[in-house]
């Protein structure tokens, strides 16, 4: 028998890899490419991995994915799509307060459960009024009441089927002449549960189901389109009223209080205080103000990269923390300001401290691949915020353009001069609103068209699940528990190891991710 073989039982297993504590013990600044996670034992399928995770103290998401409040990433279309797939979007504030609040309102109106403030018309309104409402709101199924208001007697409903083939000369026709009358309507009584109402709607094969009280007065309505959305998007992030969750960004200055008021009126579920360096008297004062005026509104503070920064914001009362400084693909803060921290170290250090107080952490920036998402979650982050990864998708703001035959969309950092010139909100984020000379902390560029996130986000979700499967963690909470207990093991990578772990040795190749 060869002398290098040891005979006997197989019970002995040598220690292998580093715990997270050991990985970050030497004060090295590590980012996601600097380490790998060692595989564990698989006894479940990838689809069984539970990705439920906390966004804030009181808000939980079924998918740990968030879109960044950047003006080339998140407006209503992105926020709606992210919420439908179990995440959440944060509407940027590099715009007027009114525009931002209206974007939030679009998200909240997209799916509503019981609609208690629908568009209502009276029999004396015209077909033209219905067409105008369709242009403004995107639908034409409108209940008709005696006075044209909620709480009035229901007398009928007008749908697209009632007016589709009317000539333009008939647009002045009164709704009383074209509406489907009350006697032909299927309705549900006030007090019915949403589940019961949906069952009635499904059986009726109608597009809308009016809810009426004992006096036959309209008190609410539910839509068949919402029933379809429930079927097609089972992971959707919703509030207690069955509306999609929506976040919004605000600054930390006095005039941001007006913006905050409009956002809360529009229905924003959570506010992120948008600052490149969150450990400031301005942010602490704003947290105190919000918690005093809107005690039930969830507030995310940041950005921070150290436990000391996190402490001040946690003491002020934040419900979540956004971690990252200078690590985004369009960010030059570390280069220009000599301030920041490699993202892997930042996430681990802040998450390890914040968990003692029940404050979830968002890993914001530096995410280039689904593997980076898994690593961020394995270091203690509850959710991951994405900018460049979602830029240039169909849902991202902006128009496509062509350069050298490639379809592109603009993507810029909120610290770029381009963004600062558009609105003072970007200047305030970087404490530059009063400066004569603006110091750019970001760049402006373009990214190749990625298509819809309706395909991209499911790929990310599946990738996270498969990553957790290889690790041996059946949920994100188990993943974090394994990390903090020391069961999860890591290993540093040399530059040669990083090259080895990528595509190499080929003359040419095509990299298709999904």
Curated annotation (Swiss-Prot):
An example of a GO molecular function for this protein is: nucleotide binding
Q: Which residues are annotated as modified residue Omega-N-methylarginine in the UniProt record?
A: 341, 355
Task: Tell me which residues make up the CBS domain.
Answer: 114-173, 179-237
**What Gene3D superfamilies does its record include?**
Aldolase class I (3.20.20.70)
Q: What is its EC number?
A: 1.1.1.205
According to the record's subunit comment, the protein's assembly and interactions are: Homotetramer.
**So what does this one do?**
Catalyzes the conversion of inosine 5'-phosphate (IMP) to xanthosine 5'-phosphate (XMP), the first committed and rate-limiting step in the de novo synthesis of guanine nucleotides, and therefore plays an important role in the regulation of cell growth. Could also have a single-stranded nucleic acid-binding activity and could play a role in RNA and/or DNA metabolism. It may also have a role in the development of malignancy and the growth progression of some tumors.
Q: What is this protein called?
A: Inosine-5'-monophosphate dehydrogenase 1
Name the gene behind this protein: Impdh1
